[in-house]
C-alpha cells in the first residue's frame, strides 16, 4: 500500500513539474523588450560593428537575420515613464502606444542589402529621436518598440 501511494505522489509531482517548468522559462514581453531594445550601458560611439555585436548578443540573429532593430541608450526608468506620456495609435491600429515627450539617444540597426544568414551584417546609425512604444500590464511597462519620429 505504501509503494502505491509513493507511486501516485511521484506521478503527481512529475505531472506538476512538467506543467510548471515551461512557464518558468518563457520570457515575458517586457523582458523581451529589454533584451532587444535597451542598451543603458552606453552607445554605439559610431562603431561600425556595434549593431553586429548587439544583434548577436540580443539573440536576434538566431535562425535568421532580424531586418531592423533600434536600441535605446537611456535609463530603463526613463523609457518606462513613456508609458504614461502621450497616447498614440500603434502602426497595427492598437491604442496602447505612447510617444516620448523628448528626443532620446538611439541606435538604428538595419540589415545591409547583400547580407544573408548566418553572416548578418548591419548598418549602424545614431540618432536623437522621439520613440513610440507599446505598453501593457499594471503597472504599464514597455512590451514593443513601434517607431521613431
Swiss-Prot record:
Keyword Lyase: yes
Catalytic activity from the UniProt record: an [RNA] containing cytidine + H2O = an [RNA]-3'-cytidine-3'-phosphate + a 5'-hydroxy-ribonucleotide-3'-[RNA]; an [RNA] containing uridine + H2O = an [RNA]-3'-uridine-3'-phosphate + a 5'-hydroxy-ribonucleotide-3'-[RNA]
GO CC entries: extracellular region
EC number(s) reported in the record: 4.6.1.18
Family matches, as CDD domains: RNase_A_canonical (cd06265)
Gene Ontology annotations of biological process type: defense response to Gram-positive bacterium
Leader peptide range in chain numbering: 1-25
Coarse class of the protein's main subcellular location: secreted
Alphabetical keyword list: Disulfide bond, Endonuclease, Glycoprotein, Hydrolase, Lyase, Nuclease, Secreted, Signal
Glycosylation sites: 62, 87
One GO MF term attached to the UniProt entry: nucleic acid binding
Biased composition (Basic and acidic residues): 30-40
Membrane-crossing residue ranges in chain numbering: none
Region (Disordered), start-end ranges: 30-49
Any matching Pfam family: RnaseA
Top enzyme class: lyase
Subcellular location: Secreted
Expression sites by tissue: Pancreas.
Bridged cysteine pairs (disulfide): 51-109, 65-120, 83-135, 90-97
Active site: 37, 144
Binding site for substrate: 32, 35, 66-70, 91, 110
Role of this protein: Endonuclease that catalyzes the cleavage of RNA on the 3' side of pyrimidine nucleotides. Acts on single-stranded and double-stranded RNA.
Subunit relationships: Monomer. Interacts with and forms tight 1:1 complexes with RNH1. Dimerization of two such complexes may occur. Interaction with RNH1 inhibits this protein.
Family: Belongs to the pancreatic ribonuclease family.
Record's protein name: Ribonuclease pancreatic
